[in-house]
Amino acid sequence: MVIGGDAGNDKTAPPRSSSTSEEVETLAKGADIIVHSAIHPVMGPDKDSGMPPPIFYRQSTASDLGALAKRAGVKHLMLTHLIPPIGAARQGPWTIPGGALKDTDFKRAAQDGGFTGDIIVGVDLASLRLPAK
């Protein structure tokens, strides 16, 4: 299991090839699951959310996490600490273009990154049980 966050993003502003950390990717190789905080791409500065670029670029997008999970060869990807939260009308002072998101929106974003494994959209206090090998 690899648990990742955003503090290790290699580059927090463009140009960058990915919003994820090389360190997390290295640790993820051969893991069963990645558990990582995620922001939905709809909050990006090229959208109409109003979220300042420096805040957006500190996060890892669900689509980049999907790509990382594919490259690492993991079976499961759990997205946590979601920005914006599922069903929220706003993320703090910022709007959510297109309205509140569903868990399927986060799953689709990870799939857009190329991941075809199991995607779990975590909610607060979620628990997870992996099958025994």
Question: Which sequence ranges carry the predicted segments?
Answer:
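Residue-level marker for buried hydrophobic side chains located in beta-strands
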Residues: 1-3, 121
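Cap/insert and terminal regions of metallo-dependent hydrolase folds
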Residues: 8-123
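C-terminal regions of proteins
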Residues: 121-133
